[in-house]
Amino acid sequence: MRCPNCNSLDTQVKDSRPTEDSSVIRRRRVCIACNFRFTTFERVQLRELTVIKRNGRRVPFDRDKLVRSLQISLRKRPVEPERVEQMVSAIVRELESGGEADISSETIGEIVMDHLRKLDDVAYVRFASVYRNFREAKDFEAVLGELSGEEEARPALVRK
């Protein structure tokens, strides 16, 4: 592994441990040349995914882009970073195990929205407003109506 500080290839792993859900290995490393310490993460990649954009262009799937878009949707929301990481891992696993190496951006967006709907309603609406390209207030009303309908269908919690 190349040192991000001095570009030396002479680094040593000091500590390795799985994350809480065991989907990632976290490694603490030290550069032998400059003593710089850094962390790397190792994930299983089942297949190389390609995203087919709305304009037909093909680009490699970027997990970090998914993380950034979720962080924007979840900004100032009471959601722990660990939950976000678990959700991202679940989304990527779902995409990789789908059997197709080429995935449309629409499919990715729908999967993300399904996961966000379960995690945080506000983040779901924020993501939907960008993903579905909302132009008017009625677009928001429609999504809020969907969420309200789901809330009515769920049994209410009785508090004593």
Swiss-Prot record:
GO biological process: negative regulation of DNA-templated transcription
Disordered, as annotated region: 1-20
GO molecular function: ATP binding; DNA binding; zinc ion binding
Top-level lineage group: Bacteria
InterPro entries: ATP-cone_dom, NrdR-like_N, RNR_NrdR-like
Keyword line: ATP-binding, DNA-binding, Metal-binding, Nucleotide-binding, Repressor, Transcription, Transcription regulation, Zinc, Zinc-finger
Zinc finger residue extent: unnamed: 3-34
Cofactor binding note from Swiss-Prot or TrEMBL: Binds 1 zinc ion.
PROSITE patterns: ATP_CONE (PS51161)
Residues in ATP-cone domain copies: 49-139
Keyword Transferase belongs to the record: no
Compositionally biased spans, kind Polar residues: 1-11
Cofactor: Zn(2+)
Signal peptide: none
Keyword Protein biosynthesis: no
Functional description taken from the UniProt entry: Negatively regulates transcription of bacterial ribonucleotide reductase nrd genes and operons by binding to NrdR-boxes.
PANTHER family per UniProt: TRANSCRIPTIONAL REPRESSOR NRDR (PTHR30455:SF2)
Family of the protein in this entry: Belongs to the NrdR family.
Protein name per its UniProtKB record: Transcriptional repressor NrdR
Organism field: Rhodopseudomonas palustris (strain HaA2)
